[in-house]
């Protein structure tokens, strides 16, 4: 009984601790039915703390129910214009989600895209009507733009507008279905002047395709699939008039930020496969939503900050989507994601961690490095391994001249460029303070060596060490090891010596193999940060040794078989020693 009581006394607290631990783990994901990921310094996806939490779901505008909504616009004053495509109308709500008005009934035929200016002028891309409709703030139709008549547009091309944005000058940029020339640029002057195409995607062709097409006949080439640029899937415009596009299948060019010449100014290493919508944030950041509900957030340089969200599995969990059509960012940094299948708008709220990161991101992008350090410090207090925060902190310290601190954070974030620059500056500072001493030491060493050489010449002070070294060098194993240098200088004579003069043995060859393995492992795992190719703290020495041995056996075996076929005189051990 005493033993049973002791066991119970020990087991009960342990079980309670396990229950508390499991409960805390469940609570972590109770508010978000998805995980949040970021990219570490090695370019691998790693889980991080939740960046955005589901806040609410908008299923109705006032008492109006949406049917297959395909786009929406959120203004700074809180007004939201939803393109209720199933009902062929636009539904407008205020900041409290109260219905303001509806318009477009009887005019819209197959609306796909909407853009609303700060003055509440509404532009609608209507695919079925083959037109762009413009409505004033009261919902009255004021203008209609149809297919441009300019020959440069293309006589055989149809005008099937899908998405639209408008800059501050009133120039419209329209994505049209099956138009691979780029976005259609239309000025409102003279009732709609076609200005040309903007932001055309490049064609993609690998070396094999180019070579294959070169040897085919004209008839065979005609049967091949045409190599034409992809049409953008969606776009957004920021307050400066810079246009962002997304195009599936473009890999590093999936997300583009286009300058005035239509050239991409951003490149991302992590990109979604099926992008559906893009939005510009309030802190020089960009959001891309996939059709399946995943949301990617990038900073101003194209570095991936977060991936979160996901596809609903039918359980109707808040925060998960079925088919995303559009994404918008509110002035309070909340994210609004339109789901056409569910006919609702999911709203996500940034966590405290994300708010600090956004503040730091904005200050850093504006060159206010000293101010950015405080929010960056808050971020690192919550997650000291967050790559972007360490990278930004390192760059901020570098700008201030704190190169030691910059070196530390650059190493944590695996920022090779900043690490190299910081190391260079530290070396320069060291040389400025120690160059004279280094020169004097080198002169002193040179003088000592000269003096020792003179003494040895007159007194023979190094005769005893020379005799000892000569005696050591005359030993068989040492001679065999030294033969390596002869072999490198004269490989043909070296092979002859191995085959007919037994200049080396299996023992000396094995010693050289072990030395080579040791140097390989040291070079791989214990080299400098800038040249290291493996994760710090990650060791797989047995696999490395096995790989070397397997490669050696294969090479020796292949050479032996070739020698045998060609009636060579070398034996297996000779080939092993020569390699």
Predicted feature descriptions by range:
Residues 29-390:
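Eukaryotic scaffold repeat domains enriched in small/polar residues
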Residues 362, 396, 429-430:
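Residue-level signature for tetratricopeptide repeat
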Residues 389, 422-423:
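TPR alpha-solenoid repeat register
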Residues 398-420:
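TPR/TPR-like (Sel1-like) alpha-helical repeat modules
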Residues 431-455:
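Selective detector of the "anchor" transmembrane alpha-helix that sits immediately C-terminal
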Residues 456-510:
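N-terminal juxtamembrane cytosolic/stromal segments of multi-pass membrane proteins
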Residues 504-524:
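Hydrophobic alpha-helical transmembrane segments of multi-pass membrane transport/permease proteins
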Residues 531-579:
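Alpha-helical transmembrane segments with an aromatic anchor "belt"
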């Amino acid at each position: 009984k005493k033993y049973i009581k002791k066991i119970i006394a020990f087991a009960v607290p342990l079980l309670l601790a396990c229950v508390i631990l499991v409960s805390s783990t469940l609570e972590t994901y109770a508010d978000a039915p998805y995980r949040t990921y970021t990219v570490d310094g090695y370019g691998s996806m790693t889980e991080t703390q939740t960046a955005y939490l589901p806040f609410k779901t908008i299923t109705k505008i006032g008492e109006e129910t949406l049917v297959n909504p395909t786009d929406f616009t959120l203004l700074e004053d809180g007004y939201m214009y939803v393109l209720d495509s199933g009902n062929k109308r636009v539904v407008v709500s205020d900041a409290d989600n109260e219905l303001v008005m509806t318009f477009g009934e009887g005019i819209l035929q197959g609306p796909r895209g909407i853009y609303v200016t700060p003055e509440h002028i509404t532009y609608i891309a209507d695919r079925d009507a083959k037109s762009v409709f413009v409505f004033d703030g009261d919902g009255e139709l004021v203008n209609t733009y149809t297919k441009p008549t300019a020959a440069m547009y293309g006589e055989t091309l149809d005008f099937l507008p899908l998405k639209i944005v408008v800059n501050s000058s009133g120039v419209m940029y329209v994505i049209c279905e099956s138009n691979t020339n780029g976005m259609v640029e239309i000025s409102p002057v003279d009732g709609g002047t076609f200005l040309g195409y903007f932001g055309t995607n490049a064609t993609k062709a690998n070396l094999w395709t180019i070579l294959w097409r070169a040897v085919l006949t004209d008839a065979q080439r005609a049967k091949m699939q045409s190599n034409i640029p992809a049409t953008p899937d969606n776009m957004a415009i920021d307050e400066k008039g810079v246009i962002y596009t997304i195009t599936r299948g473009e890999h590093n060019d999936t997300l583009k930020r286009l300058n005035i010449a239509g050239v991409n100014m951003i490149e991302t290493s992590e990109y979604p496969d099926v992008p559906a919508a893009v939005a510009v944030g309030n802190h020089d950041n960009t959001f891309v939503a996939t059709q399946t509900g995943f949301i990617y957030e990038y900073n101003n340089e194209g570095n991936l900050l977060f991936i979160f969200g996901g596809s609903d599995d039918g359980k109707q969990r808040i925060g998960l989507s079925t088919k995303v059509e559009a994404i918008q960012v509110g002035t309070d940094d909340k994210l609004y994601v339109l789901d056409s299948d569910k006919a609702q708008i999911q709203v996500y709220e940034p966590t405290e961690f994300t708010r600090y990161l956004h503040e730091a991101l904005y200050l850093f992008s504006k060159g206010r490095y000293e101010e950015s350090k405080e929010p960056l410090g808050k971020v690192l207090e919550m997650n000291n391994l967050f790559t972007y925060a360490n990278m930004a902190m390192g760059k901020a310290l570098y700008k201030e001249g704190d190169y030691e601190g910059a070196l530390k954070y650059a190493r944590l974030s695996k920022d090779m460029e900043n690490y190299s620059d910081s190391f260079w500056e530290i070396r320069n500072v060291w040389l400025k303070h120690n160059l004279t001493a280094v020169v004097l030491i080198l002169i002193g060493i040179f003088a000592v060596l000269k003096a020792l050489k003179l003494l040895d010449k007159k007194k023979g002070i190094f005769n005893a060490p020379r005799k000892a070294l000569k005696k050591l060098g005359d030993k068989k194993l040492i001679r065999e090891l030294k033969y390596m240098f002869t072999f490198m200088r004269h490989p043909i004579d070296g092979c002859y010596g191995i085959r007919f003069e037994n200049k080396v043995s299996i023992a000396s060859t094995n010693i050289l193999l072990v030395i080579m393995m040791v140097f390989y492992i040291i070079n791989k795992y214990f080299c400098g940060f800038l040249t290291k190719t493996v994760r710090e703290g990650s060791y797989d020495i047995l696999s490395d040794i096995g790989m070397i041995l397997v490669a050696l056996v294969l090479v020796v075996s292949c050479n032996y078989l070739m020698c045998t076929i060609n009636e060579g005189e070398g034996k297996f051990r000779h080939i092993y020693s020569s390699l």
